[in-house]
Regions:
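Bacterial Sec-dependent N-terminal signal peptides
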Residues: 1-26
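Phosphate-group recognition and catalysis centered on beta-loop-alpha active-site segments
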Residues: 17-302
Length: 302
């Protein structure tokens, strides 16, 4: 009896010493965004870091995770047999060894093709489905599904099947009322971020609607030139401590010329300007490793 009690006591002791499961990286990143403030800058790899691997490929996702990217941006297309795949263009021509519209090919046929790299050379990599991409990213990185609202009724079941709903970012340029009507309760699960082109006539109205109705955790902002800085500067002040600010450095007219190309010559004038002057806390880039190196040199990324 004493031996039995001893064993029970030891089992209880070791059970008490067992640590709770650690929070996965995607959950930690999600919580950081939900807080609406951070002393770091999050890095988004556009089309899954296409400079390293074919765009929208599993290899690109895996490399992004390896180097420390926080969000991978992926694009969706629908096959003839209604399967969501990861691809930017509506046609296969540019990024694969096939030709024609994605919507005219079945998944089985698309899986026979090879992805091309940035130079247009075919590789060993294949076109991934949405499900395959989400499983590669699960628990490791947040995923921005671009223009997912086109296929929302098909996307949601895949998110649920893979258990990745809470690591998904969706964005769009519609007014808050339209977003609420389309997304409904899904807004409680995903991270939704409005896209606001600050140079447009209705920009202030769109922003005010989102601030009042949705209160998003982050906003994607674009502007064309530094002659348009008044409103971006105002938003930095208005949203400080309330929401993160996402800027794109993919090309010049998204960020007033402070883009990836300028960053190769002067990263302080590009990335540094967006961070220090406009309060950028999320940057989407086509040069993820270069941006990460810059941020780490300033202790703005782990």
């Amino acid at each position: 009896m004493k031996k039995y009690l001893y064993i029970v006591a030891m089992l209880a002791f070791f059970a008490g010493c067992t640590k709770a499961p650690e929070q996965d990286r995607a959950e930690e990143l999600r919580n950081r965004i939900l807080e609406g403030k951070t002393d770091k800058v999050l890095v988004v790899a556009h089309r899954g870091d296409w400079r390293y691997a074919p765009e929208n490929s599993i290899a690109g996702i895996e490399h992004s995770i390896k180097v420390g990217v926080d969000v991978v941006e992926l694009d969706l297309q629908l096959t003839r047999d209604s399967v969501l795949i990861i691809m930017h263009d509506a046609t296969l021509n540019r990024t694969t060894t096939g030709k024609g519209r994605v919507s005219e090919w079945t998944l089985d046929s698309i899986k026979t093709l090879k992805l091309k790299n940035g130079a247009g050379i075919h590789t060993k990599h294949r076109v991934p489905t949405l499900e395959e991409a989400l499983l590669a990213a699960k628990g490791k990185v947040l995923v921005n599904l671009d223009k997912a609202d086109r296929y929302l009724d098909l996307v949601v079941p895949v998110l649920e099947k893979t258990g990745t709903t809470k690591q998904i970012i969706m964005k769009g340029g519609r007014p808050a009322e339209s977003v609420i009507a389309s997304y409904g309760d899904l807004l409680d699960e995903i991270l939704y971020m409005p896209i606001v082109n600050l140079y447009k006539d209705d920009a202030r109205q769109i922003m005010e609607g989102h601030m009042a109705l949705l209160k998003p955790c982050a906003y994607e902002l674009t502007y064309r030139t530094d002659d348009e800085l008044d409103y971006p500067l105002q938003l930095r002040e208005d949203l400080s401590g309330k929401a993160l600010l996402w800027y794109n450095t993919l090309w010049d007219t998204l960020c007033g010329g402070h883009d990836d190309d300028l960053a190769l010559e002067d990263p302080d004038a590009a990335y540094g300007f967006l961070i220090d002057t406009l309060g950028a806390t999320i940057i989407q880039t086509d040069r993820a490793e270069y941006l990460l190196s810059y941020l780490r040199s300033r202790h703005l990324h782990d």
